């Protein structure tokens, strides 16, 4: 059975009775009309009153408010998702600001840690290494025939929480919920996948409730061959799918991206999505301060695949603004646990090599340290922008922030590590230490901060501003690849929707209530660039806009007609 996004067409449904009520994509619960109850053998299986979806959503909202902890709210919402997806997305849409942190970061981190404990019902595909010889059969078992977006993880680097084994499935489920909520992609077109390649988390291996393969992680050639077999099977089943890599370990994330980005329509959200939203935020923050990104000096704390991916996108944007690549690289400084990345450092990873600073150019620095700390770098570089992707809490100390503020009246500080327990500094501290003069954007949601009687909204530099629009743009345009230029177009479009840029004040990023508008705009920009680059069929702007509108799913019930299987 094919699901269509065409809103005014009736759906022809072969299921009836209790089977239909157990089908989350089709179940309406108490909203089935009397005619549908008669036609689909539902008479007597539901209470008498026929409700609207808004009446159902109001009851769900009242029930939601009865839960006291965020994890209990998460479990409740996931139960609705697994019972009635249309109602789930209507409820989320009605209370987006309240519920987005519950269905995704930061609450999803706890849900991943407790996945086997709170497990209720299967969702998505669990591909175990033990079943590596049955990949085609596994994918044929998926009821969604027209899958257009897949989010896949192997659970090894879940947020800042490390190896969660199959508990990492919470991330693809949550991520795809945002593709639908923010980007209008029908849930019938989405598929979460976790690769169960074992776990090195001893706590999970010892947990009698753990539901994954109790085995140390496979590695090296064995691992890469398995991933390749899975991707080839996905290509055979859904050749035009958009595949998003999510929360793979640093040692695997970049190699997998480089290996497959020109073989299948794919991207890594931790590397490219984080980079795109960060660059968009920095463009907006720079313009809000009356300058360009190319005029800034940028220091990173964290030089893993995500940090280096952001740095490379920043460098590309600086080059777009007129500097040479060499000049751009001299404005970006990467600090990891061993200090500033410099030439001659041992054990640098391949993606770090182009981001080192030359030791000979640091001879005038005011320091005697061999390993240059974050404080050394801030004191000597005098940066305008400080970005944290370290996954380690509290490393943006008062001394470091005050040192930065001493040389920069409006510092841009972005502690991006997730979840909130891993943030490099809280917005409250950053703004207090800078007398409210810092521009702050975080990776996790934070409430507004009050300093000296003035309230400051905190922009959440969340990838959900970017990846839903990219997904919608790829689907609407039929793009066969996700290129760097498409990602840069997404960044620029996000910056154009900044209240700070457009109004001269307010948050750096748009409000969540406007995220669907932003996603549509990003989809158009991404689709247009895809056409210009030849990775999508060229159409008129009007046709592309119509395709975006046609593919934008809304959580509304459709009329059902009965048919045979």
Curated annotation (Swiss-Prot):
One of its GO terms (cellular component) is cytosol. This is NAD-dependent malic enzyme. Its EC number is 1.1.1.38. It catalyses: (S)-malate + NAD(+) = pyruvate + CO2 + NADH; oxaloacetate + H(+) = pyruvate + CO2. GO terms for molecular function: malate dehydrogenase (decarboxylating) (NAD+) activity; metal ion binding; NAD binding; oxaloacetate decarboxylase activity. InterPro entries: Aminoacid_DH-like_N_sf, Malic_enzyme_CS, Malic_N_dom, Malic_N_dom_sf, Malic_NAD-bd, Malic_OxRdtase, NAD(P)-bd_dom_sf, NAD_malic_enz_proteobac. NAD(+) binds at residues 157, 270, 418. The active site is at 104 (proton donor), 175 (proton acceptor). Keywords: Metal-binding, NAD, Oxidoreductase. The record marks 270 as: Important for activity. A divalent metal cation binds at residues 246-247, 270. Its cofactor is Mg(2+); Mn(2+).
């Amino acid at each position: 059975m094919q699901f269509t996004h065409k809103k005014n067409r009736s759906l022809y449904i072969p299921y009836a009775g209790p089977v239909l009520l157990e089908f989350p994509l089709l179940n309406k619960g108490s909203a089935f009309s009397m005619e549908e109850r008669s036609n689909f053998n539902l008479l007597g299986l539901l209470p008498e009153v026929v409700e609207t979806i808004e009446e159902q959503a109001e009851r769900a909202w009242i029930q939601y408010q009865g839960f006291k902890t965020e994890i209990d709210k998460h479990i409740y919402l996931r139960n609705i998702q697994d019972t009635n997806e249309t109602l789930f997305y209507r409820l989320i849409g009605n209370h987006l600001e309240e519920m987005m942190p519950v269905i995704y970061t930061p609450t999803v981190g706890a849900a991943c840690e407790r996945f086997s404990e709170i497990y209720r019902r299967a969702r998505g595909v669990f591909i175990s290494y033990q079943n590596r010889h049955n990949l085609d059969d596994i994918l044929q078992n998926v009821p969604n025939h027209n899958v257009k977006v897949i989010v896949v993880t192997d659970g090894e680097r879940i947020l800042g929480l490390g190896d969660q084994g199959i508990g990492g499935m919470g991330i693809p489920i949550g991520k795809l919920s945002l593709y639908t909520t923010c980007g209008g992609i029908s849930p019938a077109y989405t598929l979460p996948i976790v690769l169960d390649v074992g776990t090195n988390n001893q706590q999970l291996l010892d947990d009698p409730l753990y539901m994954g393969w109790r085995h140390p992680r496979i590695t090296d050639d064995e691992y890469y061959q398995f991933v390749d077999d899975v991707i080839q099977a996905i290509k055979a089943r859904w050749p035009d799918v958009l595949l998003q890599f999510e929360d793979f370990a640093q040692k695997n994330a970049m190699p997998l991206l480089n290996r497959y980005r020109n073989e299948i329509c794919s991207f890594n959200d931790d590397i490219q999505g984080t980079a795109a939203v960060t660059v968009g935020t920095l463009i907006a923050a720079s313009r809000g301060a009356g300058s360009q990104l190319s005029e800034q000096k940028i220091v990173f704390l964290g030089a893993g695949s995500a940090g280096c991916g952001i740095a490379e996108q920043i460098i590309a944007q600086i080059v777009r603004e007129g500097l040479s690549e060499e000049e751009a690289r001299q404005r970006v400084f990467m600090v990891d646990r061993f200090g500033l990345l410099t030439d001659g450092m041992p054990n640098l990873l391949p993606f770090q090599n182009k981001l080192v600073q030359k030791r000979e150019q640091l001879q005038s620095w005011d320091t005697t340290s061999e390993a240059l700390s974050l404080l050394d770098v801030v004191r000597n570089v005098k940066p305008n922008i400080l970005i944290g992707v370290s996954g380690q809490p509290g490393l943006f100390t008062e001394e470091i922030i005050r040192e930065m503020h001493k040389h920069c009246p409006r510092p841009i500080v972005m502690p991006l590590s997730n979840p909130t327990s891993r943030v490099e500094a809280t917005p409250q501290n950053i703004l207090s230490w800078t007398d409210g003069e810092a521009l702050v954007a975080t990776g996790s949601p934070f409430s507004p901060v009050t300093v000296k009687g003035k309230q400051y909204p905190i922009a959440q530099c969340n990838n959900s501003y970017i990846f839903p629009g990219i997904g919608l743009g790829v689907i609407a345009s039929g793009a066969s690849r996700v290129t760097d230029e498409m990602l840069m177009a997404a960044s620029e479009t996000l910056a154009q929707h900044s209240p700070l840029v457009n109004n001269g004040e307010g948050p750096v990023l748009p409000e969540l209530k406007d995220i669907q508008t932003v996603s549509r705009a990003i989809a158009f920009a991404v689709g247009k660039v895809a056409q210009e680059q030849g990775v999508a069929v060229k159409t008129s702007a009007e046709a592309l806009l119509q395709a975006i509108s046609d593919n934008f799913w809304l959580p509304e019930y459709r009329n059902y007609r009965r048919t045979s299987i």
